Amino acid sequence: MTELKKIPSPSHPADEGGNTIEARFAHFSKNDLRLDDDKFLAQATKLLDESKHLLMANVPALGTGTLDEAERYWFAFVLYSVRKLSENGDSVEKGLNLCQILRAARLNIDDFYKELYQFLIKVGSILSNLYGGDWQKRLEAKESHTNFVHLFCLSKKYKNAYRELFSIVNANNDKQLNVANASGCESDYYRFGWLLFLALRVHVFRPCKTLVSCTHGLVSVLAILLIHVPAHFRNLNLNDSERIVMRGDKADLVASLCNMYGTSEDELRKTLEKANNLITDILKKKPCLASECKPANLENIVTDGLVYFEGLMDESSLSSSIYLLEKDYDAATHDMDGLDEMIFLNENDSLLGSGSLSGGATNSYGNGTKRKLDAMSSPAKTITSPLSPHRSPICHSNGFIVGGISKMASTPVTTAMTTAKWLRTVIAPLPSKPSAELEKFLTSCDRDVTPDVTRRAQIILEAIFPSSGLGQNASLMDNIWAEQRRMEAMKLYFRVLQALCTAESQILHANNLTSLLTNERFHRCMLACSAELVLATHKTVTMLFPTVLERTGITAFDLSKVIESFIRHEESLPRELRRHLNSLEERLLESMVWEKGSSMYNSLIVARPALSAEISRLGLLAEPMPSLDAIAMHNNMSCGVLPPMQALLKHEKHGQNGDIRSPKRVCTEYRSVLVERNSFTSPVKDRLLALNNLKSKFPPPILHSAFASPTRPSPGGGGETCAETAVNVFFSKIVKLAAVRINGMVERLQLSQQIRESVYCLFQKILSQRTTLFFNRHIDQILLCCFYGVSKISQLTLTFKEIIFNYRKQPQCKPQVFRNVYVDWKALRRTGKSGPDHVDIITFYNEIFVPAVKPLLVEIAPGGSAQSGSQVPEAKNNTNGVNPSSPRTSSFPSLPDMSPKKVSAAHNVYVSPLRSSKMDALISHSSRSYYACVGESTHAYQSPSKDLTAINNRLNGNRKVRGTLNFDDVDVGLVTDSVVANSLYVQNGSCASSSHMVVKSEQQDS
């Protein structure tokens, strides 16, 4: 069996002349960056020296693959890492920030972050040896990247709002610029506003810089500008009844801005007060009540509660105000190592180059797939997934439609504001204690568990939203923010818990739910899910997923048990938050449940005893949960930085609450729901399947079984234990997710149905017979290898480069999937080979995949036992009355969302989703309004079922309809049911008879 061969990385030509990489790094640091801190440079040189062999091995995978660019990336990575992780407090080190490093290296910010994740995976063990095992938390790479993405979105929001509300002018000469032709908002007023916003971020928001709070800050700045910028430069039409809120015969400015940008009026007024205080403190301006001084600028505007600063925008003082704000920002951020946030004033800054978000928005956390910023508000392809159920928006008695019907484009900022509105209007008014109906269930247990439930909720939510866990950086506002988030999460928790108890009692025909309501792990999962939705709504920078798992002591596998039930029983949940939970569940399935420490392995050793030795050898088992008392102790420690949760673990007794390492819940329901994988994008099609016809066939899942002991007999019978049932259900979800991704890749690669079924069959066999291949890996790594292996045994001219090229176009693609695959060389000692812990996909294929699955590949090869056994020849004599031309039964699972759907019971009318291959070419930002796509609404949160009517009304409203379709005419040539049925399957075709794997040598596409 021929192996893939890699082309060796080129050596640096300059090395032969004695000009070493260390010398070039020293020149870069001292000459380009002007660094003279010998201690800092010594640490950076040491990291470079220990990692340079990894640089030379990965030159083709960095940037465009040139040696010079790869070195510049590596130098930037090294300096940034040492700057963040070093404990040296010298002034030179403190003066170095990311923007300075990237300017010297001629790199832009977004490309830097995209490649940084690959660097950290490669050098992780080196960083751990040099800086300790907590280096990832101290480096805060994901948090820093998220902060950049948020700032970019906020800067775009500010620019668009400014252009909408003001003429673009220069205060010095009152020269009005052409808004349409201006590349940036070249205005002193514009600059003043952004600098005031940065002052709010530095002095007011500080650690809790959420997207929601920052948006309130941005809108408060707009309010100050509207109050002080001369009225003849305003574009705001006070007679616009759709946008302006009138109080009597005058416009309410604050209420109008809330109406326009979805902010809370109470929060906006509080933020506006803080912004006014900054103007007083930094600019030394004297405030006065607008109602008393009655400036001409506020004619026809309600002045109650507004503050006015005389001369704030005068030409004589504006320049000095800008200077003071810049000076204040520089002083406040001098010791910081992150972004210089003033770069967003110039959208043509080289740091916001064509490869960055200014030209293409990237998926957060290392996704290399680039999208235009407009794609964040326009649809992006969504892959289906067999996860959680979908609910249509619910209209409540208070008249609030979840999410609202908004005309604003769905951007990260508007999404955050609309989901925050749901928290304010639906969740915030709820009581912060169990309702009477919930108390009925809590008191109906063998003992009253109400005190336990409330105490646990307080402790766990205090751990997730700590009041004093930030040491000297803590402030009153931080504590107020944390308390507000705790209340929101607690109210949501009680609300969903009540709905779950009601559903369980109906299934069991009893109100005594002792086994469920006394289960510690169940409650922590529910609290974690509630807190995650609150965090996702506010879009925090410092508490990204999986923070809720770490602070509650549960694992990804645990959380996956409640996601479906949470979505099912909270009908008011906005569509964006349902998508967020669905994307989390997909993230859990594809990789997180396979990571070390997943409680899935604790169930797997019971369900599959043969795997226990390998699981134990790799140390994959999950640790017991920390006790509630340990978490409470952790919360009460207020000195400096809190110690790791693991240091305070008190192992719970075996058997408490069943078994705290319980397996996946029993679930016999067939689930086929689709997942949107990036909460920053709105999908073209959710492809959410209607489950109404399935609910009558399958009973809803019983949560009692989800958290039962692994060795307990399954309530479903059949002689299975709960662990076996859990693993079977979990594997079925993995297979369904794989089927969806296989289907997407087959469509992109334009492969036959036979290849699709072979890849699917091979994946199934690997999951059941070679399960260890998934340990510590991503399921897409196995899928990519399956595609290549099947293409070789089928004698297709399909290269790994083509496979990876098309995989890059998949929405879930992350470069680390094919660049960094885990390999356990200890298990290969017999071969005498060794290497790094993470290798590229080709090395993994050659060294691990082929030796493990070669027998399985032979089975599915043309003429193999599995393949031949699955092919049923077409019957020549139809004795059962079946149509001879009926398609053969496919082993590939049905994906109804990809097939035409009959939408009329009386007529042969079908609606089919736009396929991805056509969608990529057709749907651009300028043309997307011409298409109606499944799952995308014409208005925010509106049910997609209303879309066709809305589009028809829009198209037909201004023109006469010259004729109508005659559905009763049999000669009009409509497609019949039989034609559609036959079109869904590809007829059996001939295939190569050879079962040998012909594998060509090729270079991996990186």
From Swiss-Prot:
It is found in: Nucleus. It comes from the Eukaryota. One of its GO terms (molecular function) is RNA polymerase II transcription regulatory region sequence-specific DNA binding. Residues 866-898 are annotated as: Disordered. Keywords: Cell cycle, Nucleus, Repressor, Transcription, Transcription regulation. The keyword Transport does not apply. Residues 411-855 are annotated as: Pocket. Residues 866-893 have a biased composition (Polar residues). One of its GO terms (biological process) is cell differentiation. Residues 725-855 are annotated as: Domain B. Residues 411-604 are annotated as: Domain A. CDD domains: CYCLIN_AtRBR_like (cd20601). Disulfide bonds: none annotated. PANTHER family: RE32990P-RELATED, RETINOBLASTOMA-ASSOCIATED PROTEIN RB -RELATED. Regulator of biological processes that recruits a histone deacetylase to control gene transcription. May play a role in the entry into mitosis, negatively regulating the cell proliferation. Formation of stable complexes with geminiviridae replication-associated proteins may create a cellular environment which favors viral DNA replication. This is Retinoblastoma-related protein. It comes from Scutellaria baicalensis (Baical skullcap).
